[in-house]
A protein has these predicted regions:
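N-terminal catalytic cores of NTP/NDP-binding nucleotidyl/phosphoryl-transfer enzymes
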Residues: 7-72
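Glycine-rich, highly charged phosphate/nucleotide-binding loops
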Residues: 68-76, 100-106
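A glycine-rich helix N-cap at a beta->alpha junction
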Residues: 72-88
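A short acidic, helix-capping loop that chelates divalent metal ions and anchors anionic groups
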Residues: 57-63, 161-162, 301-302
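Classical nucleotidyltransferase
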Residues: 96-214, 304-317, 322, 328, ...
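Phosphate/ribose-recognition catalytic cores of enzymes acting on nucleotide-derived substrates
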Residues: 197-340
């Protein structure tokens, strides 16, 4: 999949089938739209192109009221590639784009910049300054300028409309199974493993210098307001052949010293329950990991001192092991029933 920053690019000369949106989370509704776009593009012999925005337009207009982020740009692009998208155009959402008229958006960006021949949009799609452009305007312009326009109605699961807002609601309330149902996969965060304070390896260590305590794999979340936060049962992918069971903290770590320079930064800190020997030595630093958040244990807590924090982490690890054991037992019972 090719990625372009902006629409004025010498390699964006081929006519395309296009859809436009924020695609936060790339949920099942997005996936259905992309499948429809891919089918139409194949029929017409066109590449599948997606135009998205960074930052989210609502972060530009009202940063204090902007929605929490489900996925980073990295994770969004990864999921778009999995959906068979050929090209993604990432438009920086700045003043010029915010003030552009709907007519100029069609003429300058869609026609001149992206060479559209077919455009698929959602039933609530709006564009241009003041959100004046809609499906009817786009369809009329297509008839006059030589490109086809179609729209897709809302996608529903169990009678409920699938949307990024619904995913955010499930994540904010810790309903991870509901979020996975809407996403079509477990909610996950990926990124490079980065160095932290290395405080975790001291907590619960067998001796002050042993470094065998609750060491963590740390990933930065690029947005200050993630859709989920708290303590989670997780699986870590990408560092070993098999996924690693663990427990993770996603948030700002309120138990850190107020003077700590890292306090307030959003991190995903994952403690692997059973560290492989090679990973325990080299720590996975610099590698890309994907962490699936499977079950929420509780919100972030502020502990009164390191001994209390150590006891809290130990309890979280025990609860995570119990959750995995319960899931394994349920899977085994289901397998037995299927064989009968």
């Amino acid at each position: 999949m090719r990625i372009f920053r902006g629409y004025r690019h010498r390699d964006l000369v081929e006519p395309c089938a296009l859809t436009i949106g924020n695609f936060d989370g790339v949920h099942r509704g997005h996936q259905a739209m992309l499948a429809l776009l891919r089918s139409e593009a194949q029929h017409r012999g066109l590449p599948v192109r997606v135009m998205t925005f960074e930052p989210h337009p609502r972060e530009y207009f009202a940063p204090d009221r902007a929605p929490a982020r489900i996925s980073s740009l990295r994770d969004k692009l990864t999921e778009l590639a999995r959906c068979g998208v050929d090209e993604v155009v990432v438009l920086p959402f700045r003043a010029a784009l915010a003030q552009q008229s709907a007519e100029d958006f069609i003429g300058d960006i869609l026609l001149e910049g992206l060479q559209v021949r077919y455009v698929l949009v959602g039933d609530d799609f709006r564009f241009g300054a003041g959100r004046r452009g809609d499906y009817a305007m786009l369809d009329e312009a297509g008839g006059a300028m030589g490109f086809d326009v179609a729209r897709m109605n809302s996608y529903e699961v169990h009678g409920l409309r699938v949307s990024s807002s619904a995913v955010r609601g499930a994540l904010s309330e810790g309903r991870m199974r509901d979020a996975a149902d809407l996403l079509g996969r477990p909610y996950s965060i990926s990124g490079h493993v980065v160095h932290g304070r290395k405080l975790g390896r001291e907590l619960g260590a067998s001796s002050p210098a042993a470094g065998d305590g609750f060491r963590t794999l740390n990933l930065r979340f690029s947005h200050p307001q993630p859709a989920a936060s708290g303590i989670f049962v997780v699986q870590v992918h990408g560092l070993t052949a098999a996924p690693l069971a663990g427990v993770a903290n996603l948030g700002v770590r309120p138990s850190l010293d107020p003077a700590d320079v890292n306090r307030g930064q959003v991190l995903l800190e994952s403690h692997v329950l059973d560290w492989p020997a090679d990973l325990a030595v080299e720590g996975g630093y610099g590698k890309i990991a994907r962490v699936d958040l499977l079950h929420k244990l509780h919100d972030e807590l502020k502990y009164d001192g390191l001994p209390a924090l150590t006891r809290g982490i130990a309890q979280d690890c025990e609860d995570a092991r119990a959750w995995f054991a319960s899931r394994h037992s349920q899977t085994r019972r289901q397998t037995t029933r299927d064989r009968i």
